[in-house]
Curated annotation (Swiss-Prot):
Region spans: PABPN1-binding: 217-224
Region (CPSF4-binding): 174-209
GO biological process, one term: symbiont-mediated suppression of host mRNA processing
Motif range (Nuclear localization signal): 34-38
Physiological role: Inhibits post-transcriptional processing of cellular pre-mRNA, by binding and inhibiting two cellular proteins that are required for the 3'-end processing of cellular pre-mRNAs: the 30 kDa cleavage and polyadenylation specificity factor/CPSF4 and the poly(A)-binding protein 2/PABPN1. In turn, unprocessed 3' end pre-mRNAs accumulate in the host nucleus and are no longer exported to the cytoplasm. Cellular protein synthesis is thereby shut off very early after virus infection.
Higher taxonomy: Viruses, Riboviria, Orthornavirae, Negarnaviricota, Polyploviricotina
Protein name, entry field: Non-structural protein 1
Taxonomy, superkingdom: Viruses
Organism: Influenza A virus (strain A/USA:Iowa/1943 H1N1)
Motif Nuclear export signal, residue numbers: 131-140
InterPro entries: NS1, NS1A, NS1A_effect_dom-like_sf, uS15_NS1_RNA-bd_sf
Keywords, comma-separated and alphabetical: Eukaryotic host gene expression shutoff by virus, Host cytoplasm, Host gene expression shutoff by virus, Host mRNA suppression by virus, Host nucleus, Host-virus interaction, Inhibition of host innate immune response by virus, Inhibition of host interferon signaling pathway by virus, Inhibition of host PKR by virus, Inhibition of host pre-mRNA processing by virus, Inhibition of host RIG-I by virus, Inhibition of host RLR pathway by virus, Interferon antiviral system evasion, RNA-binding, Ubl conjugation, Viral immunoevasion
Entry's Gene Ontology molecular function annotations: protein serine/threonine kinase inhibitor activity; RNA binding
Localization (cell): Host nucleus; Host cytoplasm
Family designation: Belongs to the influenza A viruses NS1 family.
């Protein structure tokens, strides 16, 4: 006898038993009860043909189903991404203006900054999603002065969807270099430090040498 035929019958017997319990608790409608009666007759006929006892087959079917359910529960669930926010909705949606606008496209990201800003303390904040403890998708990054003015921004290009963690790190480096060129002091939020800009110093980034600053600033020379 085909083992699959036997196991199929056993599982059908157990599932019928489950449906019978549902009916016993008055949870089945008329079509449900009608199918239950018809399937009972079918199982009796199959059991007679196969020479199998329905009660014994029901117990075996239960073991099969329980084993499958245990295997399902043991499977690791797919990791879910988390959305992290440094900025409020107001900070994300606020319009801002630049006296000396500069812009650079770095792969799938657009970097904008105001080159007129000098000698300011600036913090970078971002809203983004995280998966496997790494930045997954940048929604928006903005640079704020201590007074709350927006002086820089990194945003995904709608025409080039998709970017990597390295794309974001490179764009942050360009923005920091451009801002530091004008003697601004730039800090990175703790959230960004953890997921997108890991480094050794308290500001969340290794200090740039003057040569590196000049190189970073040159990369952002193209006008808006």
């Amino acid at each position: 006898m085909d083992p699959n035929t036997v196991s199929s019958f056993q599982v059908d017997c157990f599932l019928w038993h489950v449906r019978k319990r549902v009916a016993d608790q008055k949870l089945g409608d008329a079509p449900f009860l009608d199918r239950l009666r018809r399937d009972q007759k079918s199982l009796r006929g199959r059991g007679s043909t196969l020479g199998l006892n329905i009660e014994t087959a029901t117990r075996a079917g239960k073991q099969i189903v329980e084993r499958i359910l245990k295997e399902e529960s043991d499977m690791p669930s797919a990791p879910a991404s988390r959305y992290l926010t440094d900025m409020t909705i107001e900070e994300m949606s606020r319009d801002w203006f630049m006296l000396m606008p500069k812009q650079k496209v770095a792969g799938p990201l657009c970097i904008r900054m105001d080159q007129a800003i000098m000698d300011k303390s600036i913090i970078l904040k971002a809203n983004f999603s995280v998966i496997f403890d790494r930045l997954e998708t940048l929604i928006l990054l903005r640079a704020f002065t201590e007074e709350g003015a927006i002086v820089g921004e990194i945003s995904p290009l709608p025409s080039l969807p998709g970017h990597t963690n390295e794309d974001v790190k490179n764009a942050i480096g360009v923005l920091i270099g451009g801002l530091e060129w004008n003697d601004n002091t730039v800090r990175v939020s703790k959230t960004l430090q953890r997921f997108a800009w890991r480094s050794s110093n308290e500001n969340g980034r290794p200090p740039l040498t003057p040569k590196q600053k000049r190189k970073m600033a040159r990369t952002i020379r193209s006008e808006v």
